[in-house]
């Protein structure tokens, strides 16, 4: 699994929110996420992800090579791996993959209900109304949803509106 969720990053927004997500997945409270704990993170974000993708992600974001993802590495995962947009083909492919993660019904648009569902899976407590507000910040065409072009633009602006 490559870059996955700039929408989550922009919705979480603050370091405190990212810490809460980290703590939710750090089941044993040791301040680091193991491979098994990472599997749960990935399952919440992408139920169809393969075990190989978990291993790849661990290698990519375990910056100090100790076999765990600590809070700093988790933040990097959100800032670089999950939220990073760009111009090369892999980045566009990664963005498309991230977009599809939220587009649960596959209609090419992320609705407030879809965003709410993903946020809920991540343990975030936000209402559908909160998600509508988040979407309205990047909804250029005013249809109440985020299409892929709006998603790309949001990500090229650093994950926020």
From Swiss-Prot:
Binding site for Ca(2+) 1: 26, 28, 30, 32, 37
GO molecular function: calcium ion binding
Entry protein name: Calcium-binding protein CML24
Record function comment: Calcium-binding protein that may positively regulate abscisic acid (ABA) inhibition of germination and seedling development. May be required for photoperiod-induced flowering and function in ion homeostasis.
Residues that bind Ca(2+) 3: 103, 105, 107, 109, 114
Domain EF-hand: start-end pairs: 13-48, 49-84, 90-125, 126-161
Tissues where this protein is expressed: Expressed in seed coat, seedling radical, cotyledons, hypocotyl, shoot apex and elongating root. Expressed in the vasculature of cotyledons, leaves and roots. Highly expressed in guard cells, trichomes and hydathodes. Expressed in inflorescence stem branch points, silique abscission zone, young and mature styles and stigmatic papillae, mature anthers and developing seed.
GO BP annotations, alphabetical order: innate immune response; long-day photoperiodism, flowering; regulation of flower development; regulation of nitric oxide metabolic process; response to abscisic acid; response to absence of light; response to auxin; response to calcium ion
Binding site for Ca(2+) 2: 62, 64, 66, 73
Classification of source organism: Eukaryota, Viridiplantae, Streptophyta, Embryophyta, Tracheophyta
UniProt keyword terms in alphabetical order: Calcium, Metal-binding, Repeat
Positions that bind Ca(2+) 4: 139, 141, 143, 145, 150
Domain of life: Eukaryota
A Pfam family reported for this protein in Swiss-Prot or TrEMBL: EF-hand_7
Inducing or repressing factors: By rain-, wind-, and touch (thigmomorphogenesis), dark, heat and cold treatments, hydrogen peroxide, ABA and auxin.
InterPro entries (UniProt xref): EF-hand-dom_pair (IPR011992), EF_Hand_1_Ca_BS (IPR018247), EF_hand_dom (IPR002048), EF_hand_pair_protein_CML-like (IPR039647)
């Amino acid at each position: 699994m490559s870059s996955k969720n700039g929408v989550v990053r922009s919705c979480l927004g603050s370091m405190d929110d990212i810490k809460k997500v980290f703590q939710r997945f750090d089941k044993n409270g040791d301040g680091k996420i193991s491979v098994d704990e990472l599997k749960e993170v990935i399952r919440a974000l992408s139920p169809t992800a393969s075990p190989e993708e978990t291993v790849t992600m661990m290698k990519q974001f375990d910056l100090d090579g100790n076999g765990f993802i600590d809070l700093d590495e988790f933040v990097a995962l959100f800032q670089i791996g999950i939220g990073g947009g760009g111009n090369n083909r892999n980045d566009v492919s990664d963005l498309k993959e991230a977009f599809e993660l939220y587009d649960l019904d596959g209609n090419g648009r992320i609705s407030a209900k879809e965003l709410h569902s993903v946020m809920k899976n991540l343990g975030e407590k936000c209402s559908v109304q909160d998600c509508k507000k988040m979407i309205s910040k990047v909804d250029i065409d005013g249809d109440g949803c985020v299409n892929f072009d709006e998603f790309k633009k949001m990500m090229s602006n650093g994950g926020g509106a």
